[in-house]
């Protein structure tokens, strides 16, 4: 059998792949590690320059400590100098050994770079600006773990829209503020504060007029208290998970549509006046305020949220369409006192006109739980779906069977105000669970 022909050249059965067009070869290389993709340059002349057009580079020191006779950082510099693609969509650097040459690596990037992720497991310094071209073209920048951020000189990330800072350290208090002020069109800021030995700041000033999404997580609460001063008038999405932090919001956030707040009760009260415009809210520590725009409410139930609180929230959310209750009891039902639920004087407006979806995960079947279920199902005229789920441990499955059957029958017997409501009952088994 004769070998097939492509154009004027014979193609051997052992090397058909080499005659594929560049875009397909680049697609193939995207599925293997970058160091392996670079090694294909040794296969033949056809492969020698293909990797240089790869739109993404993933350089991981853990899987490639040395590149030939070169150290990892030296090899990276060589690769970045050799890269010829007009646009480098993504560059991912993972450093395992101490390096003070990250900025030198960045200075070797020739093409337009849109996204960069730098993860360092030993303290490594990034100094800006060393490569002004990179600073001007970046759209997404993610710095993770033991990266020391040093912004000592004026710099402008004129295209940067997303900035993630995860457990990084700052060379001085001004580095964080200077970095934010250098991002005139920033829309997304994800700030993860590490424990005390990771970063030196205990106060953060976030003044970003263009910011639309802000996420703050502070895991240092056991070691210190962190203070945040925030001015983000264009914010739409807010997530805060800080147990012992202090927040000062300088101005209102009229565009806010979704918030997830996990903070101490005092700080949550301070935040409430900024949350009255939200459409989606996840918050365990609410007080009585009117949320006219709230369409979605998710509550993680614990001892601070009893039945009275849930019904009060329904009263203060007149346009609510979706209610999600998530409960994972930490102690036995028999150890918990029965609490009678006080019904509001009038049926909440959301039950009469708007509530369409109810999800209750971890329904425990306590008397007050049943009272809440009876009240909501018996008054929600527009309810389409009510999904109620129970959790129990695999080790006590048989022990709970009879009790569970009783609870299921109780739920099925509840009279529903909405004739179109579909009641869905689910059971989930957890490995270890005290109930």
UniProtKB/Swiss-Prot annotation:
Protein's organism: Arabidopsis thaliana
UniProt-listed Pfam families: F-box, FBD, LRR_2
Protein name: Putative FBD-associated F-box protein At5g56820
Lineage: superkingdom: Eukaryota
Annotated F-box domain residues: 14-60
Coiled-coil blocks: none
InterPro entries on file: F-box-like_dom_sf, F-box_AtFBL13-like, F-box_dom, FBD, FBL13/AtMIF1-like, LRR_dom_sf, LRR_PRU1-like
Domain FBD: start-end pairs: 341-390
């Amino acid at each position: 059998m004769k070998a097939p022909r492509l154009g004027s050249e014979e193609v051997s059965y052992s090397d058909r792949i080499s005659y594929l067009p560049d875009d397909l070869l680049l697609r193939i290389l995207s599925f293997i590690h970058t160091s392996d993709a670079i090694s294909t340059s040794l296969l033949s002349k056809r492969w020698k320059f293909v990797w240089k057009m790869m739109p993404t580079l993933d350089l991981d020191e853990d899987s490639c400590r040395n590149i030939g006779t070169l150290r990892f950082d030296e090899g990276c510099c060589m690769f970045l100098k050799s890269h010829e693609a007009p646009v480098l969509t993504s560059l991912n650097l993972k450093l395992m050994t101490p390096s003070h040459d990250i900025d030198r690596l960045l200075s070797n990037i020739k093409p337009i770079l849109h996204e960069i992720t730098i993860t360092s497991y030993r303290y490594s310094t990034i100094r800006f600006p060393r490569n002004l071209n990179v600073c001007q073209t970046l759209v997404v920048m993610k710095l993770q773990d033991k990266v020391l951020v040093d912004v000592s000189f004026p710099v402008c990330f004129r295209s940067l829209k997303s900035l993630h800072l995860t457990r990084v350290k700052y060379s001085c208090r001004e580095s964080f503020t200077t970095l934010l002020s250098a991002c005139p069109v920033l829309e997304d800021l994800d700030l993860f504060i590490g424990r005390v030995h990771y970063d030196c700041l205990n106060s953060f000033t976030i003044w970003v007029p263009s910011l639309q999404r802000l996420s703050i997580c502070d895991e240092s609460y056991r070691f210190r208290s962190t203070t945040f001063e925030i001015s983000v008038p264009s914010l739409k999405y807010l997530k805060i998970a800080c147990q012992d932090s202090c927040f000062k919001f300088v101005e209102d956030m009229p565009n806010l549509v979704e918030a997830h707040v996990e903070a101490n009760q005092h700080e949550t009260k301070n935040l409430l006046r900024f949350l009255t415009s939200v459409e989606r809210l996840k918050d365990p520590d609410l007080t009585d305020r009117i949320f006219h725009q709230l369409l979605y409410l998710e509550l993680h139930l614990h001892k601070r949220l009893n039945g009275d609180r849930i019904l009060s929230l329904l009263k203060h959310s007149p346009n609510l369409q979706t209610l999600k209750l998530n409960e994972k009891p930490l102690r036995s039902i028999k150890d918990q006192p029965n609490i009678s639920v006080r019904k509001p004087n009038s049926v909440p407006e959301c039950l009469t006109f708007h509530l369409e979806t109810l999800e209750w995960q971890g329904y425990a079947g306590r008397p007050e739980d049943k009272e809440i279920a009876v009240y909501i199902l018996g008054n929600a005229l527009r309810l389409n779906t009510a999904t109620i789920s129970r959790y129990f441990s695999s080790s006590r499955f048989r022990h709970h069977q009879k009790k569970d059957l009783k609870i299921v029958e109780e739920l099925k017997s509840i009279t529903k105000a909405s004739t179109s409501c579909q009641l869905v009952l689910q059971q989930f088994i957890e490995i270890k669970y005290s109930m």
